[in-house]
UniProtKB/Swiss-Prot annotation:
One example GO MF annotation: lipid-A-disaccharide synthase activity
Gene3D superfamilies, per the entry: Glycogen Phosphorylase B
Enzyme Commission number(s) of this protein: 2.4.1.182
The protein, known as: Lipid-A-disaccharide synthase
Lineage start: Bacteria, Pseudomonadati, Pseudomonadota, Betaproteobacteria, Burkholderiales
């Protein structure tokens, strides 16, 4: 059950009186959503100034933008069908608490940021109560069989799509959708500053650098961490001149990776707090868990190896749901495999080490990926924060709320 100490209420909304200060409520469920939402907050603040406050569930980056997180984001940072069962009671209690708070004090608008399983269940009753609802980040309805789109139709007034092929899918279902590009494409430089990133992280000079990102959730790091470290050890034996950099998204994750590092003291490893962008910018190649980080690596124009491991039952459910043949965003956006994916039983230390070194040493492939990912970057760079803010403000204005 959610602790009483975190059952705060959100600041009251403004109703229809534009002269009063109002609240836009937002919920982000993990580190990637926190990053995306923080960038969106910048666009909203530019449009609305200080007439509106922002509250709900968010992380450190959102709070840096003035967001008030009434519940801990870590409650929602659980992934996978089996893994979520241990936290299900707390997750559902949190959703009931924020739902009741928002219905008692209606915000100007509710913005769900990714976390579709949590947010759609929250958005349906909020929209039914007349609260404008925008969902930022389309779920993978193009990867799953299409039953999910019926839930989306009940849940949202508008959906903001990160990728150019998505709005057409929603148009066929009669759901308002706008392609806004990806905010990371606006903030990641078109030309990476590799030397600057290495200097900032104080990485060893004269070494080729492998960035290692086993995930931003504890479940991910526990599933992949040992395998990744064993792969790093094999790479070190094959090329002792390699340096590794691993960004830990939180203090608990840092503790896990530091414990793993003790088993492989020979590794030339730099563990950094967060700062995944700089770690990838500094790298020659990236070994990482499937997720938003794969797109970040592509925007930094890096060769990479994508991996993922989930419990057997979770994997079987995912297979039955009809996933695409690839899970990494660079491959999905390309419509083909441009970087290797090693999943489940294929994600052995031997295979990960071999594929990562192949990616590191294939100069022709490195040149191809740099050009290919540059074109992808140009497509996704759309001034997302402004476009997304425009949709939200226009929706509120159509209801006479601002």
């Amino acid at each position: 059950m959610v602790d009483a100490a975190i059952r705060g209420t959100l600041p009251a909304g403004t109703g229809t009186n534009a002269s009063q200060r109002g609240t836009i409520a937002m919920v982000a469920g993990e580190a990637s959503g926190d990053l995306l939402a923080s960038l969106m907050l910048g666009g909203l603040k530019a449009r609305l100034g200080d007439t509106v406050s922002y509250a709900g569930i968010g992380g450190k980056r959102m709070m840096t933008e003035g967001f008030v997180s009434q519940w801990p984001m870590e409650t929602l940072s659980v992934n996978g069908y089996v893994e979520v069962l241990g936290s299900l009671r707390e997750i559902l209690a949190t959703r009931r608490a924020i739902r009741d708070s928002l219905l008692a004090n209606p915000p100007l608008c509710f913005i769900g940021v990714d976390a579709p399983d949590f947010n759609f269940g929250l958005e349906v009753p909020l929209r039914r109560a007349g609260i404008p609802v925008v969902h930022f980040v389309s779920p993978s309805i193009w990867a799953w069989r299409g039953g999910r789109i019926r839930t989306i139709a009940r849940a949202v007034d508008h959906i903001l799509c990160l990728f150019p092929f998505e709005p057409e899918i929603y148009a066929k279902a009669g759901i308002p959708a706008t392609y806004v590009g990806h905010p990371l494409a606006d903030v990641i430089p078109m030309v990476p500053d590799v030397a600057g990133a290495r200097a900032a992280l104080d990485l060893p000079a004269g070494c080729r650098v492998v960035a290692v990102l086993p995930g931003s959730r504890q479940s991910e790091v526990r599933n992949l961490g040992a395998t990744f470290f064993a792969a790093m050890a094999r790479m070190h034996r094959m090329d002792p001149n390699l340096a590794f950099v691993l960004p830990a998204a939180s203090a608990p994750l840092r503790a896990i990776v530091e414990e793993l590092h003790q088993q492989y003291p020979e590794l030339r490893l730099t563990i950094v707090d967060g700062n995944s962008h700089q770690a990838m910018e500094a790298a020659d190649v990236v070994l990482l868990a499937s997720g938003t980080a794969t797109l970040e690596a592509a925007l930094y124009k890096k060769p990479m190896v994508i991996s993922y491991k989930v419990p057997w039952l979770t994997a079987q459910i995912m297979k039955r749901q009809g996933y695409l043949p690839y899970v990494g965003l660079p491959n999905i956006l390309s419509g083909r495999f441009v970087v290797p994916e090693l999943l489940q039983d294929d994600a052995t230390p031997e295979a990960l080490a071999r594929e990562t070194l192949l990616q590191l040493n294939d100069q022709g492939n490195i040149a191809f990926l740099y050009e290919h990912f540059t074109r992808m970057h140009e497509t996704l760079k759309c001034n997302t924060a402004q476009l997304a803010a425009d949709v939200v403000v226009d929706l509120m204005r159509s209801r006479g709320l601002v």
